[in-house]
Amino acid sequence: MIFWKNFFQNSNINASSEKNFKKLIVLDKTCDKIEFKDIYLSSNKNINLYELEQLCDSVGWVKRPLKKVKIALKNSSIIISLIQKKDANSKLVGFARATSDNGFNATIWDVVIHPDFQGLGLGKVVIHQLIQQLRQAEISTITLFAEPDVVSFYKKLGFIKDPDGVKGMFWYPR
């Protein structure tokens, strides 16, 4: 339990509530000047499927049938999205979700940050928020599946690869 307390106390996420959104203080230091990004965190489960599809396309994910994506979202315990608001427009720039047995275990799925917003700590924000909500629900085991090129990112957030030699197993129809 000490690990989780330190995990969230050491978080440098600044947010203030605004209805269903939390405004994040995000600075883009990649250009010559420091620029503020108007990004809000939401746990609203009503996600525009077409915006989500565009976000997934932006990182090169394989297209999935929207009908099945809708079912997956409906069956998710937690959905976190990051929305950039500019004037009257808004854009989905980050997303992740978790499924759970609501007793012991949960799995994090579909963590995606738009390429224009990667490197700003937003992936860390999304994962921290999911873990925080799952721990509040007293979920003790949180798993995820990661592509080889992002395993180091999750290790930095406290995830352990193959703990105690445990291996994930899959069954696929032939």
UniProtKB/Swiss-Prot annotation:
Protein source organism: Pyropia yezoensis
EC supergroup of this enzyme: transferase
Molecular function per GO: N-acetyltransferase activity
Chief location of this protein within or outside the cell: plastid
Pfam families (alphabetical): Acetyltransf_1 (PF00583)
Family: Belongs to the acetyltransferase family. Ycf52 subfamily.
Keyword Metal-binding: no
PANTHER family, alphabetized: ACYL-COA N-ACYLTRANSFERASE, GCN5-RELATED N-ACETYLTRANSFERASE 2, CHLOROPLASTIC
Highest classification ranks of the organism: Eukaryota, Rhodophyta, Bangiophyceae, Bangiales, Bangiaceae
Entry keywords, A to Z: Acyltransferase, Chloroplast, Plastid, Transferase
Domain of life: Eukaryota
Any GO CC annotation of this UniProt entry: chloroplast
Protein name as catalogued: Uncharacterized N-acetyltransferase ycf52
Gene: ycf52
Residue span, N-acetyltransferase domain: 42-174
Enzyme Commission number, as recorded: 2.3.1.-
Entry's localization field: Plastid, Chloroplast
